[in-house]
């Protein structure tokens, strides 16, 4: 009751033990992408962009803002990295030198923008955002269904490429064709073992003719297309054979001839990429792996040194409790504030 809350003061301490520079083996690295030459891997960790040698070692922190940075994308020459940052309130596309330095903001729309790929000539960055549906391809719900745009790497006016969702873009070397995963309806991208009419498929889009072609038609999820350096084989992530996400591949000439590349049993494989020398790179169970041809996956041993600030905050609550209950003997009261369970004596002692 209101009286009950007036008499009980709850003090919450939020945060973690204050640490001054520490080294740790990180877990739950996300948005993983290997560099074109296969020597480095960019990834997101705790809201910052890092890169690490593909053979493992100490990671280099590239962004240091208080904001959240994610989705690093290498330029074709490996000299720049595009990424998303919400440092101005919503996610915009930025680009920075791959060795670190000042980042340039490329997009300013009030919606969120997520970079997907550079064009092969390195002149444009493709990104997804829910900005403006064309009349002929408006989708519901509008805020969840994006369109595909491009922006010059040097900055300038954005241009709509497709009026329908197209994510995880992968170009062929000519730049005339790109592969993408579709989005037919809204579904949490982290949901596992999802089968329905709106599961993602992999498509090609011919920029010269405007033709879309579906390459995968199975009932589950197919996503994250990656074209091999020879331009003949497409790698992708899929939930097939009753299992979780693994890496699969098929020859472009025979999309129905799908073969498994990895055979992880427990957790999904995420964030697939490939270097120009054919090295696969992906995330599994929070860590990063590389894989050459038909050889076994190799875990990348990574060390991250951070100087995290104190994140302790003291909060005083006199209202807002939910799910209150009284013990059977009437002497104690249990309640929840901010997702935490507290117990106090009924006489407020």
Residue locations for each model-derived region?
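A flexible loop/linker signature enriched in serine peptidases of the S9 family
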Residues: 25-26, 44-50, 58, 63-69, ...
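Conserved beta-strand position repeated across blades of beta-propeller domains
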Residues: 33, 73, 117, 170, ...
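Glycine-rich phosphate/pyrophosphate-binding loop
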Residues: 315, 320-326
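Bacterial N-terminal signal peptides
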Residues: 11-20
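Mature N-terminal segment immediately following signal peptide/propeptide cleavage
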Residues: 24-54, 325
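Positively charged n-region of N-terminal signal peptides that target proteins for export
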Residues: 2-8
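Residue-level detector of Asp-centered blade-edge/turn motifs that repeat once per structural unit
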Residues: 36-37, 76-77, 120-121, 173-174, ...
